[in-house]
């Protein structure tokens, strides 16, 4: 049963100090309050709390759109076979992540490679995640893993079944260049194709080079900063400067390459092509703060404004994948993160903390207007806790385990 089945109360979010919009073109907002009705943002600024059933006073803290992990290795259920961890998605919500996008359920034990098997896996994952929402999280799962046996008819059928994601890089191809027919077939059916980029990630896979990416022209260059092994510098420059490919940067990649990609993207005005993800759970581990840590790194080590970097992990991804949530905008779902500088940080507010590389403290996470976390069990304590009227106990699972 969906975790979002019960409508959220009419909620006013007040005393906002800084508003991040998730819009790469205008990453800061001016509203000091928000009104949420039926899980959606219906008013920005000037909110009268009289009719609100719940008031969340953020005490001058920052309100931002929920983060979207654009590279999260889900399989089925809130469990990762790769790291044998239960409940990781529920924990990721405490890292500000309100949506994740699957790059293919490749960690399924005994994953099939035949056409009927990979189609069945994509459909069952899509169906499962359509109604399974750990702690309210929206999981965009069911990505078809491209194999040489798949035909155009297969992709057209998959599209009728609601499959809208595909991953290239783990199929049984002798040469990745041979995947061109499947990439084009998926795209022609309206399925978004993410391609592995860089060196081989696991035994049995193979490197995807710049030549492959320029030939295949996927919709998204997955972990273009390495997953975890990066492409060479000159290749990265070509992909940024001479193509319109989406540039996905991940925590489990090469930080040096990520910094180079950001610098080039800023130089050529390609900010709208950058999105962020964690590329976890993988051998790198399970990282509830993976996206937030990536934001802190890029906001402190590049010339990108922290609000723009946050937008790369929210609204920019929503634009690429045509997601409803991801921006603080009228009519959008109220997927929100309330955060401030962590207690003891020398940064001023969440933006100041990020600018010096500190992970902000999260004091509330809302998904579709419903409070899913108050005191985050994963971030440092926020310098400014929220106050909820009437009083609301911390949702189950919020406790720190000492």
Protein language model annotation of sequence segments:
Residues 1-50:
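N-terminal metal-binding scaffold of metallo-dependent hydrolase/deaminase domains
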Residues 12, 66-68, 193-194, 276:
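Residue-level marker for buried hydrophobic side chains located in beta-strands
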Residues 50, 58-123:
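Metal-associated gating/positioning segment near the N- to mid-region
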Residues 81-89, 147-158, 204-212:
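Short, acidic/polar
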Residues 88-117, 129-146, 160-173, 191-194, ...:
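Divalent metal-dependent hydrolysis catalytic cores, especially in the metallo-beta-lactamase
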Residues 163-285, 302:
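Active-site core of metal-dependent hydrolases
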Residues 263-342:
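His/Asp/Glu-enriched, well-ordered alpha-helical/loop segment
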Residues 333-387:
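C-terminal cap of metal-dependent C-N hydrolases
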């Amino acid at each position: 049963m969906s975790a979002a089945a019960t409508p959220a109360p009419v909620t006013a979010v007040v005393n906002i100090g800084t508003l991040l919009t998730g819009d790469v073109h205008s990453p800061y907002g001016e509203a000091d309050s928000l009104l949420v009705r039926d899980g959606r943002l219906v008013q920005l600024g000037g909110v009268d709390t009289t009719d609100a059933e719940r008031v969340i006073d953020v005490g001058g803290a920052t309100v931002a759109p929920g983060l979207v992990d654009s590279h999260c290795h889900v399989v089925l259920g809130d469990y990762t076979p790769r790291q044998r961890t239960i409940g990781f998605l529920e924990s990721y919500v405490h890292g500000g992540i309100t949506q994740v996008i699957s790059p293919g359920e490749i960690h399924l034990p005994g994953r099939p490679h035949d056409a009927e098997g990979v189609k069945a896996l994509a459909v069952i994952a899509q169906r499962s995640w359509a109604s399974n929402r750990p702690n309210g999280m929206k999981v965009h799962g069911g990505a078809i893993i491209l194999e040489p046996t798949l035909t155009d008819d297969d992709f057209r059928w998959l599209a009728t079944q609601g499959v809208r994601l595909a991953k290239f890089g783990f199929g049984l191809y002798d040469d990745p260049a041979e995947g061109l027919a499947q990439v084009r077939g998926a795209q022609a059916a309206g399925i978004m194709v993410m391609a592995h980029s860089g060196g081989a990630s696991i035994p049995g896979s193979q490197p995807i080079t710049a030549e492959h990416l320029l030939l295949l022209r996927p919709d998204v260059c997955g972990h273009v900063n390495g997953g975890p092994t990066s492409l060479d510098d000159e290749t990265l420059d070509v992909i940024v400067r001479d193509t319109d490919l989406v540039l996905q940067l991940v925590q489990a990649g090469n930080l040096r390459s990520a910094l180079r990609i950001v610098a080039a993207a800023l130089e050529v005005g390609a900010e709208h092509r950058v999105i962020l993800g964690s590329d976890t759970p993988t051998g790198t581990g399970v990282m509830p703060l993976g996206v937030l840590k990536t934001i802190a790194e890029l906001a402190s080590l590049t010339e990108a404004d922290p609000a723009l970097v946050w937008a790369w992990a929210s609204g920019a991804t929503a634009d690429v994948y045509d997601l409803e949530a991801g921006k603080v905008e009228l009519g959008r779902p109220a997927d929100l993160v309330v955060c401030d500088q962590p207690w003891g940080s020398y940064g001023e507010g969440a933006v100041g903390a990020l600018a010096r590389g500190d992970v902000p403290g999260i004091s509330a996470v809302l998904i579709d207007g419903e409070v899913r976390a108050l005191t985050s069990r994963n971030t440092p304590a926020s310098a400014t806790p929220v106050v909820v009227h009437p009083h609301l106990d911390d949702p189950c699972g919020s406790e720190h385990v000492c």
